[in-house]
Amino acid sequence: MLQRASTAMDMKLEHVGKAALAGALAVGLAAAPAQALTKSQLNELSYLQVKGTGLANRCPEVVGEGSISPKSGQKLVDMCIEPKAFAVEEEIGRAGKTEKKFVNAKVMTRQTYTLDGIEGTLDVSGGSIVFNEKEGIDYAATTVQLPGGERVPFLFTVKDLVAKGSGGAFKPGFQMGGDFNTPSYRTGLFLDPKGRGGTTGYDMAVALPGLQSGVEGDEELFKENNKTFDITTGRIEMEVNKVNVEEQEIGGVFVATQLGDTDMGSKVPKKVLTKGIFYARVD
């Protein structure tokens, strides 16, 4: 049975603010990566020139350090969000104590994990800028691997993002951040290896039907049968470090936290941390 719940799981997201963004800058995310191209340079390339190069998974570079003062009703368009580093929160045992710590992970997904074509409205009032995400390629199924070999799937996304920043202009040092929704990694039409799904498939696996009802306390089997569509909450913080006034472009770095896959309600999700760069154009 498909269950929607906008607050299906409570998240205690670690505060990601200026310190995290400073860390992203310290590891060189703000620097122009090798082979980075501007939007105009990318537009000049043909399909065959882009094919197989990985450029389609890259965000454009912004050149300049000016200032753009948007007005209410304008939009941010062509937004691109490219993760450069991934980490997963794990429990680390040391000296008889257990602590939670983010462990660096390796991305296993081929070059299809960058969000692109995102757009949304801008609201400028009271000395602040608010960005409301509306549409675009705003989610990407991604899998990362921990040092021990465990793989963690998650839906990299910024769906329904509402990001707010203090100030009336996009300029180097401008920061904005907010919460977004993270839909389920799987949809209701997905069938597990035993043919069970959220909106289709079997209600339960064969054998031991009495235990699978949950009545007799077999919670693990019940969760495997009772598929849910969990919507959780993530958070992203962004800092502008490049502004091209002539092209009305902004670029910078971001740090985001969100929950990973719940396997449709049958397992506890892991917290995933992503760091990278972003690009957008004021329209």
Q: Where do the protein language model's features map onto the residues?
A:
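N-terminal chloroplast transit peptides
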Residues: M1-Q35
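An extracellular/secretory-lumen and virion-surface interaction module
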Residues: G28-D283
